[in-house]
């Protein structure tokens, strides 16, 4: 998890903000929309190389039906939908649930941009934390999570500072 009130932007994160200053973000309750489903399908096929086409039912079950307060964040370049993020709004934190983007727009670093937006949004809501979900040290697709500091890892049911406990990072029980 990332502490929202003490978060510090890195130089590359500043560049990512600059690169995406033209984007508009809209907040919506979870609901099916065809352009969102098409973007999800494209993302799964091209980014994760999913061999099986996704169905509307898969999309609804995974991302639309939620037992907690959830918002969908739509990221637009003018009228073109580039990305969608899902966040859960909890009493003391926001939880970044999932994020999809147009793989053709990968150079924009939309995933990084979305987390920067979510940190700022959590701060506006006076939520001290943005939860980034599990962190797997050896997963290149999750390595970006360690770039958001200060952060804490959940280890043995206790939150510990990310960089003060490097010996924990090799453990399989570590999540961020």
Name the predicted role of every residue range.
Residues 74-154:
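Aromatic (often tryptophan-rich) hydrophobic motifs at membrane interfaces
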Residues 41, 64-70, 112-117, 125-132, ...:
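Noncatalytic linker/hinge segments flanking ATPase motor cores
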Residues 1-22, 124, 128-176:
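Terminal substrate-recognition subdomain of acyl/acetyltransferases
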Residues 2-107:
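A conserved beta-strand-loop-helix scaffold within acyl/acetyltransferase catalytic domains
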Residues 30, 55-60, 104-105, 115-119, ...:
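Short C-terminal domain-edge/linker segments immediately following a structured domain
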């Amino acid at each position: 998890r990332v502490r929202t009130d003490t978060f510090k932007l890195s130089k590359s994160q500043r560049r990512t903000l600059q690169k995406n200053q033209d984007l508009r973000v809209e907040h919506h309750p979870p609901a099916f929309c065809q352009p969102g489903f098409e973007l999800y399908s494209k993302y799964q096929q091209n980014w994760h190389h999913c061999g099986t086409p996704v169905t509307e039912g898969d999309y609804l079950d995974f991302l639309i039906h939620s037992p907690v307060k959830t918002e969908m964040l739509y990221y637009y370049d003018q009228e073109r939908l580039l990305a969608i993020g899902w966040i859960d709004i909890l009493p003391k934190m926001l939880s970044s649930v999932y994020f999809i983007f147009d793989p053709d727009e990968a150079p924009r670093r939309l995933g990084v941009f979305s987390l920067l937006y979510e940190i700022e949004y959590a701060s506006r809501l006076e939520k001290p934390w943005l939860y980034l979900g599990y962190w797997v040290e050896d997963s290149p697709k999750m390595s970006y999570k360690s770039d958001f500091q200060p952060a804490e890892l959940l280890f043995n049911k206790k939150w510990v500072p990310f960089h003060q406990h490097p010996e924990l990072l090799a453990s399989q029980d570590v999540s961020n």
